[in-house]
């Protein structure tokens, strides 16, 4: 038996897992698995929304872009994980992305170590890739609901 914080009620472990912990598990799955409609995870969708909102045609440090995204797209999971998502979206070695939407400028990782050897986000730069403008109209139609409420899409 365990107790809830601030109460004297007891709660069995099975009740805790089936009623309380399940909410975290569902939320974690939503953050971890890309959406079938656009292929983005919520963090990637917020990155693209912020890049289009800023009209990111010139280079910006990955650390600065992460700060901009967390401020303007209500990202609440820490800038370190956001920086990692930006780095993964810009990787262009064989086997990393089908189509990278962000242009890498600097050491964004290598195939040998699976991208884990990327430089620190304060030393590498990125901007929108040229191909992104070609698919921009389709991406914007999926990202538009973010503009109003600044929250994840619900399909």
Where do the protein language model's features map onto the residues?
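Catalytic phosphate-handling regions of large nucleic-acid enzymes and associated NTPases
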Residues: 1-155
